[in-house]
Amino acid sequence: MSQRNTSPLKRSTVRRTLQRFWDVTRTQPLIVFLSVFSSAGYIFLLTFANTYVMALIVDRVQAGPVAGDQVFEVFGPYILALVLVNLVGQILSKLQDYTVYKLEIAGNYHLARLCFDTLSNQSMTFHTSRFGGSLVSQTSRFMSGYTGLVDVTVYSLIPTITSVICTVAALAPVVPTFTVILVCIMVVYIAFVWLMYKRIMPLSAATSAAQNKLSGVLSDAVTNILAVKTCGREDFERDLFDAADRAARDAETVSMHAMMQRNFTTSGLIVITMAVVSVFVAGGNAWFGISAGSLVMIFTYTYNLTMRLNYVSSMMQRINRALGDAAEMTRVLDEPRLVADDPDAPELKVTEGAIDFEHLSFAYRDAAAGESVFDDLTLHVAAGQRVGLVGKSGSGKTTLTKLLLRLDDVQGGRVLVDGQDVSRCTQQSLRRQVAYVPQEALLFHRSIRENIAYGRPDATDEQIREAARLANATEFIDRLPRGFDTMVGERGVKLSGGQRQRVAIARAILTDAPILVLDEATSALDSESEALVQEALENLMRGRTSIVVAHRLSTVAALDRIVVLADGEIVEDGTHTQLVEAGGEYASLWSRQTGAFLEA
């Protein structure tokens, strides 16, 4: 199972990530404005206005003593100003928190929908080449990346920009020389941080990719825990996990070392800045005649600015992590859909159910050059006809059914249903006209009732029970303590193979689609279970166009027609009796069967 694109983070990926984040953010322009306003206003009032008023108080104290009975008269306006500044500042602080919550909740909702829609509409080829656990992890990291970026923007980036502007604007008229030196130090500081950012960004992306792979390895082992245990391969899986864990740890370590190097250098620049401001504060009055209040203001503003600049390192680190976390899902979202509907694609209308495979050519995307499954295959299935597909493994039986369902697009030829090209119709309308029962029952970790009704969610309890009865599933469902409300576990692990298959068949019965595809639908059943289901399947197929894939030839012997495939070609076509009498490939397969199974 490959993990796609773990290369270092590229500028184009960063731009696309930021564009996607902005697309969901700009849907709330008022909240965005309030978040910027509250962040800038909060810093201006509680950091700069507060200090400015205190500087005025210091200057007034320095101007001369004030009698006790005149304190409120003299300092009353200053006290009132401080109270108002802090009151409004605290209100803006809470508004800042509120807007962040609103942005993150709404943004993550839209991003989750975007990821779900993208993943659910991607082709089966896309999903079979990836770990499901990694996709879940990438979705979670994509959302946490958005949350992290909103946090760092509102709580760090905007306050830092506000601090730089206010500090330079306040100090330039008072100490222009010091302001020039301060600006030069800031330029050097920001340039260094930017260079380190460009170095650390790909390291963060590599760390995120390693952690996603770790999640995929863990998910793969947990999902297939029965195979791990029955094969006694716990140690092997632990070694795989340890290798992925070490890779994630090593990636984290490399990233951490780069961050520590950056932090040491930026701390040195902060120390230099504070040394310069200390000299100016100490000699400011003697050299420039600056008042005590102004010296307090200079020191406080500069100190606050250096603290903000000190946060720039951690701010860039958080931006690195946020964009690195989001990078892999951004690439997934950017991938073209391998199977996509035309913008104006009509819905498929099935009136009879005739199926035609016309001059079909198909090869899997990861196949070697010149290695195809079908090359100019043509097959007609009349409306209402029951057709069995048989042949050795790899002959193309299941692939043909997948092309009918348009789980992949053909490279040449057409698949028609009632004369309509399925590639020109919407995928959803096509699949709602086909009841599909695969070899491995596809059950959700939900109740038996919900699983049966999945293809027809508006079905009544009576209809659900009747479908289960026809699939001979009620005989085990009624014995369960919670009956139809029994949770089946992930992929139906709480049920036996035969029970899972009967639930899947009940779903197909309830769907009542005009076309039926059975892909080894009874292969997981024991002889007793198969006997219970066979009659239900015969009733289900009556009056429906049915394609039955089987290795167990007794499953298809009674069908209207049997098509024998070999190496992607039709080598025989006829009824069971005709094919046995012909003495060809089918007769050979029939004669070699033991226990009703086709020799692999």
Q: Each predicted region: which residue ranges?
A:
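Short intracellular "coupling" helices and adjacent cytoplasmic loop segments at the cytosolic face
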Residues: 2-9, 105, 113-137, 141-143, ...
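Alpha-helical segments in transporter systems
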Residues: 30-52, 78, 82, 97-101, ...
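Transmembrane helices of ABC transporter permease
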Residues: 31-43, 78, 85, 155-206, ...
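Membrane-integrated ABC transporters
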Residues: 1-47, 61-79, 92-100, 104, ...
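An intracellular "coupling" helix at the cytosolic face of ABC transporter transmembrane type-1 domains
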Residues: 26-29, 124-128, 141-150, 154, ...
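Hydrophobic alpha-helical segments in the permease module
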Residues: 78-89, 93, 186-189, 259-279, ...
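ABC-type nucleotide-binding domain
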Residues: 348-600
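Cytosolic ends of transmembrane helices, especially the final helix of ABC transmembrane type-1 domains
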Residues: 233, 257, 304-332
